[in-house]
Amino acid sequence: MRLIHALSALGSMIVLTACDSSPQSTNVSYGCGALDVQATYSSEHVELKFGDQRVKLDAKKSASGALYSNQQRELEFWNKGAQAQLTIAGQVYPLCIDKTELPQQFSARGNEPFWLVHVNNGSASLRQPSGDRDYPQVDISKVSDTSDNTWEVKLKEDETLHISATVCQDSMSGMPYPFTAKLNRNDSTFGGCAGEPHRLISGVSWQLHASTLEQPPSIQFMSDNSVFGYSGCNRFQGEYQLTGEGLSFKPLAATKMMCAPEQMEAEQVMFEALDKVTHFTVGDNGNTLQLRNNDHTLLRLIKAS
């Protein structure tokens, strides 16, 4: 598997693919996991900005959706609606979603009492110990009188699910989720979280905070559970596992270069830390990442520009 260290070192081939109809607005801000992608559309081209990259693509004929291409940069962007898929140098990035829209499919959950709502393309289902219920058609609307992105999912007349784009921490496992949820049902309100935790960390390069090395150690998570990065001396790759209980890494493979003593020491610290990781937290509006062992912080990282 080809290793990629950071967006600034990415190769020349960037492919974006997607699903749904062309965005209605001229400017669209996508969240591709933790990677922010800004798209500016016109009738003949689209300009994409992500990390420190800014690329202009020309419109091309397409049987479905909207296709844009920059052949010199070997870059394509095909989108339909609020969702898109980004691929860079053969590496598939997390699904890109317009930040003003909810994912077409997502789950919300809470504890004490347990509840779980699955929303899937306009329908929903509720799972509770007291019984299950299906909703063949639900209405999703944006709530306009809030400071952040908030949506109301109307399950039925007296049952609603509220989703807000603020990071939520599971009350039992401590797992972070990208959305905060509230289920209103039978004159009661149940709190919880929604979305997929991997979207908080995947798609960007995270650099070790306050490193004294010229090239700081870094790590990048992808939505297919692959992980790769730079230890301070060698490049590494492998897999991570994200469950409802926490985060862990499978054994990592690394190159075998010898480096200066301070680089070798940084590498040893990083590999030992990754071997002990059980949880993660994010902060500073998603720009910082802490890899933890229970309550102890092992690595502090910042989102690379």
What is the role of each PLM region?
Residues R73-E74:
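Periplasmic N-terminal soluble interaction domains immediately after the signal peptide in Gram-negative
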Residues T26-G51:
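Post-signal peptide N-terminal segment of mature Sec-exported envelope proteins
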Residues V28-G31, Y68-S69, F106-G110, W151-K156:
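Short acidic-hydrophobic surface loop/beta-edge motif
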Residues T100-A124:
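An ectodomain-focused feature that recognizes extracytoplasmic/extracellular
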